[in-house]
């Protein structure tokens, strides 16, 4: 029978996604977490005060030693890590490059929790890209537990798990995958300790890349199908945010204006056949925008400099007296310059 706390683990991670794995490892009877590595404290918030990472906060709560080197390329940092004599390096969204000398340190393996079904969506933004690209019915996202190699997210895979994308935003899918990854990580570490873990090489011909998102990735393209627009909006929620600009026509007691908005996921409505994509209409309660095939009713909206609000509040406030029916068009911020 295996002894308790016989797996010496150095955990490496930084954001909330990684904290889920650390929390689960701390509850695993075999885990002896000898150290937690996380990125240095960074300025955050309006005051730009130094803030601890989610992983550091949890490690301190758990009473685990914390190391925060700016790099692991130097001999001193590597010697400090080697002194922990890890059986495994358990890595999740750490954010620092691990040199070959570091990858060779653990007795069993350096293992990474990656939020995609590899070899698909290697890179920095697999969760957001999975939602944005997963607009077709039955689309799924997942987790891969892989052995870390010298190439980004290209190492052999020990285990995978998946879940339906459904109506997830990238924010809600992030949380679901963090928990799934934490469970799979413990399973793989147990298999490694028992000598039954098998890592399967990835098929390079199927590899795709999930590039980091920028603000422009949130500019909504209303010429696409409503399902694709809905997936784009969910994929960039909460960050970097789905953005459009309403160009509204003048009417009785209403001056023509342009209104930039960040929009939350809404609902797909009836066909918009015969209506130009981007056309805006309202019925006094909701604002809908014509996509390439159907109308899309907006969810919560956030005008510039304001907080999220129901569309009804916007229509009763800033857009009071906006003529009902088709009343303008929506364009991307780039097209509105």
Curated annotation (Swiss-Prot):
Disulfide bonds: none annotated. The keyword Protein biosynthesis applies. Attaches a formyl group to the free amino group of methionyl-tRNA(fMet). The formyl group appears to play a dual role in the initiator identity of N-formylmethionyl-tRNA by promoting its recognition by IF2 and preventing the misappropriation of this tRNA by the elongation apparatus. (6S)-5,6,7,8-tetrahydrofolate binds at residues 116-119. Coiled coil: none annotated. One of its GO terms (molecular function) is methionyl-tRNA formyltransferase activity. Its EC number is 2.1.2.9. This is Methionyl-tRNA formyltransferase. Keywords: Protein biosynthesis, Transferase. The gene is fmt. Pfam families: Formyl_trans_C, Formyl_trans_N. It catalyses: L-methionyl-tRNA(fMet) + (6R)-10-formyltetrahydrofolate = N-formyl-L-methionyl-tRNA(fMet) + (6S)-5,6,7,8-tetrahydrofolate + H(+). One of its GO terms (cellular component) is cytosol. The keyword Nucleotidyltransferase does not apply. It comes from Desulfovibrio desulfuricans (strain ATCC 27774 / DSM 6949 / MB). It comes from the Bacteria. Belongs to the Fmt family.
């Amino acid at each position: 029978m295996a002894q308790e706390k016989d797996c010496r683990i150095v955990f490496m991670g930084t954001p909330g996604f990684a904290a889920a794995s650390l929390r689960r490892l701390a509850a695993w009877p075999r885990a002896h977490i000898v150290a937690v590595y996380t990125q240095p404290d960074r300025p955050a918030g309006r005051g730009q005060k130094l803030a601890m990472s989610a992983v550091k906060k949890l490690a301190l709560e758990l009473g685990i030693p914390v190391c925060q080197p700016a790099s692991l390329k130097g001999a001193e940092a590597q010697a400090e890590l080697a002194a922990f004599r890890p059986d495994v390096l358990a890595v999740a969204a750490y954010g620092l490059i691990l040199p070959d000398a570091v990858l060779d340190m653990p007795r069993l393996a350096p293992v990474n929790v990656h939020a995609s079904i590899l070899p698909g969506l290697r890179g920095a933004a697999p969760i957001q890209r999975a939602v944005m690209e997963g607009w077709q019915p039955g689309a799924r996202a997942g987790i891969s537990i892989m052995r870390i190699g010298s190439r980004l997210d290209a190492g052999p895979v020990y285990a995978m798990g998946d879940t339906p994308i459904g109506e997830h935003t990238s924010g809600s899918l992030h949380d679901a995958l963090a928990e799934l990854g934490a469970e799979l990580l413990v399973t793989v570490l147990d298999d490694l300790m028992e000598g039954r873990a098998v890592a399967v090489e990835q098929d390079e011909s199927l590899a795709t890349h999930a590039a980091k998102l920028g603000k422009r990735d949130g500019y909504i393209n209303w010429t696409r199908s409503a399902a694709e627009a809905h997936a784009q909006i969910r994929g960039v929620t909460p960050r970097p945010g789905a953005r459009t600009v309403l160009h509204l026509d003048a009417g009785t007691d209403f001056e023509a204006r342009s209104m930039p908005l960040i929009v939350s996921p809404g609902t797909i409505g009836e066909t918009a056949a015969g209506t130009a994509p981007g056309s805006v209409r309202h019925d006094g309660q909701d604002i809908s925008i014509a996509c390439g095939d159907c109308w899309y009713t907006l969810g919560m909206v956030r005008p510039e400099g304001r907080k999220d609000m129901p569309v009804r509040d916007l229509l009763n406030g800033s857009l009071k007296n906006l003529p009902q029916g088709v009343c303008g068009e929506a364009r991307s911020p780039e097209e509105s310059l």
